[in-house]
From Swiss-Prot:
It holds the Pfam family PB1-F2. InterPro entries: Flu_proapoptotic_PB1-F2. This is Protein PB1-F2. Belongs to the influenza viruses PB1-F2 family. The lineage of its organism: Viruses, Riboviria, Orthornavirae, Negarnaviricota, Polyploviricotina. Oligomer. Interacts with human SLC25A6/ANT3 and VDAC1. Interacts with host MAVS.
Length: 90
């Protein structure tokens, strides 16, 4: 992704803070946004039904007990594909 693009995703994941040095040069410093700002953005773009599905999905993902890395990747990919397919149907 190019730096010049101005998308909601880049706005929500990083905040550009421009500071002036003593010599007058401008430098950009990337800061992490606050978690509440990210959550507000997420709540605005998600419907209540979509948010509920996402919460259920992550609770199931977090409940996995020490799976091997390969099986974890397989289960997550299957779940994610199923979740995305259901989103398109609904």
């Amino acid at each position: 992704m190019e730096q010049g693009q101005d998308t909601p995703w880049t706005q929500s994941t990083e905040h550009t803070n421009i500071q002036k040095r003593g010599s007058g040069q401008q430098t950009q410093r990337l800061e992490h946004p606050s978690s509440t700002r990210l959550m507000d953005h997420y709540l605005r773009i998600m419907s209540p039904v979509g948010m509920h599905k996402q919460i259920v999905y992550w609770k199931q993902w977090l409940s996995l007990k020490n799976p091997t890395q390969g099986s974890l990747r397989t289960r997550v990919l299957k779940r994610w594909k199923l979740f995305n397919k259901q989103e398109w149907i609904n």
